[in-house]
UniProtKB/Swiss-Prot annotation:
<feature type="transmembrane region" description="Helical">
    <location>
        <begin position="32"/>
        <end position="52"/>
    </location>
</feature>
<feature type="binding site" description="M2 metal binding site">
    <location>
        <position position="123"/>
    </location>
    <ligand>
        <name>Fe(2+)</name>
    </ligand>
</feature>
<feature type="binding site" description="M1 metal binding site">
    <location>
        <position position="152"/>
    </location>
    <ligand>
        <name>Zn(2+)</name>
    </ligand>
</feature>
<keyword id="KW-0408">Iron</keyword>
<keyword id="KW-0472">Membrane</keyword>
<keyword id="KW-0406">Ion transport</keyword>
<keyword id="KW-0813">Transport</keyword>
<dbReference type="GO" id="GO:0005385">
    <property type="term" value="F:zinc ion transmembrane transporter activity"/>
</dbReference>
<protein>
    <recommendedName>
        <fullName>Zinc transporter ZupT</fullName>
    </recommendedName>
</protein>
<keyword id="KW-0864">Zinc transport</keyword>
<keyword id="KW-0862">Zinc</keyword>
<feature type="transmembrane region" description="Helical">
    <location>
        <begin position="195"/>
        <end position="215"/>
    </location>
</feature>
<comment type="function">
    <text>Mediates zinc uptake. May also transport other divalent cations. Contributes to zinc acquisition during infection and plays a role in the ability of S.typhimurium to colonize the host tissues.</text>
</comment>
<feature type="binding site" description="M1 metal binding site">
    <location>
        <position position="148"/>
    </location>
    <ligand>
        <name>Zn(2+)</name>
    </ligand>
</feature>
<feature type="binding site" description="M2 metal binding site">
    <location>
        <position position="181"/>
    </location>
    <ligand>
        <name>Fe(2+)</name>
    </ligand>
</feature>
<feature type="transmembrane region" description="Helical">
    <location>
        <begin position="137"/>
        <end position="157"/>
    </location>
</feature>
<dbReference type="InterPro" id="IPR023498">
    <property type="entry name" value="Zn_transptr_ZupT"/>
</dbReference>
């Protein structure tokens, strides 16, 4: 097994660390759940708007029309899917109930897993291809990816655990998001990385950024606010953004940002 593939596997596996942190101890309270949802929204917003979209637009040969167009397609695609899937909206979670509906929370967690997985898949390809061309650079990227995969695993496992009460189920769903990154690395390994077009990758990144922004503002943040009307969800958003920002600073400090 090649070193670049091993680095990609380790970076994706870091998601499980966050998953285990998300299920330790007692079943999360509503305040913890709201915080974790806000935390996830902060992660997604910062990654999408400060990392993925700018990187896509800066790709050589990528036109602003295509980049922003794919971003909008991602936004509209999410809202279209959201309309097709019947579900309870956030305000329904507190209507005539003091506790949120587990099914609604589980659905949100699944959508969160999908959004993070869509982000992690091209990220796995990028990690492998970069490490294949420059191993030292690959080590740095794998480290930064692993750092932000830990809170992503926590953000997925917390809501699933609260909805189901099952640690195995929570770890399973969190693991899926990490496996998506590993799958991306394996795919890049199978096609030797050279066939991955930078323009195609940039277009995918822009669309996924749109999906993640829509998921954050339409699903995660409103649901967190309904579960805990106090400031706790806002703290989660700020913490998520801060941790993601720190990982990006580390990335730039070691010279690969």
């Amino acid at each position: 097994m090649s070193v670049p593939l091993i680095l990609t596997l380790l970076a994706g596996a870091a998601t499980f660390i966050g998953a285990f942190l998300g299920v330790l101890g007692q079943k999360p309270s509503n305040r913890v759940l709201a915080f974790s949802l806000g935390f996830a929204a902060g992660i997604m917003l910062l990654i999408s708007l400060m990392e993925m979209l700018p990187a896509a637009l800066d790709t050589e040969g990528m036109s602003p029309v295509l980049g922003y167009g794919m971003f909008i397609i991602g936004l509209l695609g999410y809202f279209g899917l959201d309309r097709l899937l019947p579900h309870a909206h956030p305000q329904d979670l507190v209507q005539k109930r003091q506790q949120p509906l587990p099914g609604s929370i589980k659905r949100t967690a699944i959508l969160l897993t999908l959004g993070i997985s869509l982000h992690n898949f091209p990220e796995g390809i990028a990690t492998f291809v970069t490490a294949s061309s420059n191993l030292e650079l690959g080590f740095g990227i794998a480290l930064a990816v692993a750092l932000h995969n830990i809170p992503e695993g926590l953000a997925v496992a917390g809501p699933v655990y609260a909805a189901t009460g099952s640690k195995r189920t929570a770890i399973f769903w969190a693991g899926i998001s990490g496996m998506a990154e590993i799958l991306g690395g394996v795919l890049a390994w199978l096609i030797l990385g050279s066939l991955v077009s930078p323009i195609v990758m940039a277009a995918i990144m822009a669309a996924v950024a749109g999906i993640m922004v829509a998921l954050s503002v339409d699903e995660l943040m409103p649901l967190a606010k309904e579960i805990d009307p106090n400031n706790n969800p806002s703290y989660g958003v700020l913490c998520g953004m801060s941790i993601m920002g720190l990982s990006l600073v580390i990335l730039q400090t070691i010279g690969i940002g």
